[in-house]
């Protein structure tokens, strides 16, 4: 099929020849049936295959002052001498006349086309993902997954967006003014940007969801945990290991001096709790680039408003890295082991304020291979030893 020459006048005959000669018998019958209804105007869009998996679109608008048949098809059996003119007869002009035809520019907006424009190698069109925690990190993770064509998201967060963290969150000041929960505000924003995305929201704590409906997570393929609370992550770790779901834990160090992704698949060695125990005792996360026993929280507005400083670069960078790890997981790179993947962030303000780096930070500076390591089972870990007995499916 060759598209019409833009330098030549477009006619109904041009389109009729191009279309009817390249349709299957089933589609041709449907097209002929459509043509048997009179119309004053319509737009015809033609799909032209250019490869096995790709096609282009072109089309035209057809307009007439009166209702007419779009194209004329003669399905009658030819009769002998039917086409022979009688002597002295005059040829009758068609009462149908012709349409005014104007070329139109066709722009695709379907999901498959948008995803293909990103050079995406992975098929996200049937993937369903859970995001627990929609703070600065979780909001950017949700946005990235939406842009990449994920099929469905389950968003979990009980909090409202506040002015205190608006400068480092994907959502804007309008979400603060409307005084709605993060899950609802993020759903509204993502649906406006990607109408094809299916979103399920839960504006309550993860623990409450598990107690009320533990089967909610069964249809989902993957979990991002972007919460900043260690105890909640312990419970997330315990629950999803129990039901066999892979979780990617994403967290930031104070001041954005480092950020970390921990991929935990239940069949493999190690878990999130392994990072928080040493010699049988609970300790600060062992992946951290900040030495323990330091106070990083600041208070500006009031005694009730505390925060740990970092700018928007840190959560957006962590979210981008988290998506990269997810892609590697889908590609089978971590099928036999759990993985801790760290990145060194900005250290200017951290050092300026006199904070101390951890031993791991200096070790990673000397040997960058230590930033990406396989997770091993910690003999002190209560979860891996079977000693973690908390059952969040039961009421407190």
Model-derived features with residue positions:
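Glycine-rich phosphate/adenylate-binding loop
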Residues: 1-96, 218-222, 226-396
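A short, basic/flexible loop-to-alpha-helix module at the beginning of a structural domain
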Residues: 99-129
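Glycine-rich adenosine-cofactor-binding loop
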Residues: 117-160
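Flexible loop/turn segments at secondary-structure boundaries
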Residues: 137-139, 161-164, 208-210, 231-233, ...
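Generic, well-ordered alpha-helical scaffold segments in large soluble proteins
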Residues: 140, 144, 148, 186-189, ...
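A short acidic, amphipathic alpha-helical/loop segment
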Residues: 144, 212-213, 234-239
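Glycine-rich phosphate-binding loop and adjoining beta1-alpha1-beta2 segment
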Residues: 158-195
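A structured beta-alpha segment of the ubiquitous adenosine-cofactor-binding alpha/beta core
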Residues: 185-219, 227-230
């Amino acid at each position: 099929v060759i598209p019409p020459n833009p330098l030549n006048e477009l006619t109904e005959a041009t389109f009729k020849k191009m279309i009817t000669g390249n349709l299957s018998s089933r589609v041709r019958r449907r097209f002929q049936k459509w043509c048997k209804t009179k119309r004053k105007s319509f737009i015809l869009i033609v799909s032209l295959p250019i490869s096995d998996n790709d096609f282009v679109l072109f089309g035209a608008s057809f307009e007439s002052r009166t209702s007419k048949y779009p194209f004329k098809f003669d399905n009658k059996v030819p009769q002998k001498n039917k086409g022979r003119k009688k002597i002295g007869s005059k040829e009758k002009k068609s009462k149908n006349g012709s349409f005014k035809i104007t070329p139109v520019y066709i722009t695709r907006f379907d999901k498959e086309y948008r995803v293909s424009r990103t050079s995406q190698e992975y098929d996200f069109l049937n993937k369903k993902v859970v995001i627990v925690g929609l703070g600065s990190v979780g909001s950017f993770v949700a946005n990235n997954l939406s842009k990449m064509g994920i099929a469905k998201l389950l968003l979990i967060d009980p909090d409202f967006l506040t002015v205190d963290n608006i400068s480092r969150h994907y959502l804007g000041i309008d979400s603060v003014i409307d005084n709605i929960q993060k899950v609802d505000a993020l759903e509204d924003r993502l649906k406006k940007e990607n109408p094809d995305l299916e979103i399920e929201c839960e504006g309550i704590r993860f623990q409450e969801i598990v107690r009320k409906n533990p089967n909610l997570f069964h249809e989902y393929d993957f979990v991002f945990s972007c919460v900043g609370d260690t105890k909640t992550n312990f419970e997330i770790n315990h629950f999803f290991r129990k039901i066999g779901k892979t979780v990617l834990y994403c967290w930031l160090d104070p001041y954005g001096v480092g950020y970390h992704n921990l991929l935990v698949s239940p069949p493999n060695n190690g878990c999130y709790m392994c990072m928080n125990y040493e010699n049988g005792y609970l300790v600060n996360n062992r992946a951290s680039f900040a030495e323990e026993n330091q106070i990083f929280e600041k208070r500006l507005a009031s005694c009730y408003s505390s925060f740990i400083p970092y700018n928007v670069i840190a959560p957006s960078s962590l979210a981008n890295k988290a998506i990269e790890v997810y892609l590697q997981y889908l590609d089978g790179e971590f099928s036999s082991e759990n993985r801790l993947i760290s990145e060194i962030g900005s250290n200017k303000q951290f050092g300026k304020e006199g904070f101390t780096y951890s031993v791991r930070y200096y070790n990673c500076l000397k040997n960058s291979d230590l930033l990406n390591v396989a997770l091993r089972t910690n003999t002190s870990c209560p979860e891996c030893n079977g000693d973690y007995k908390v059952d969040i499916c039961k009421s407190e």
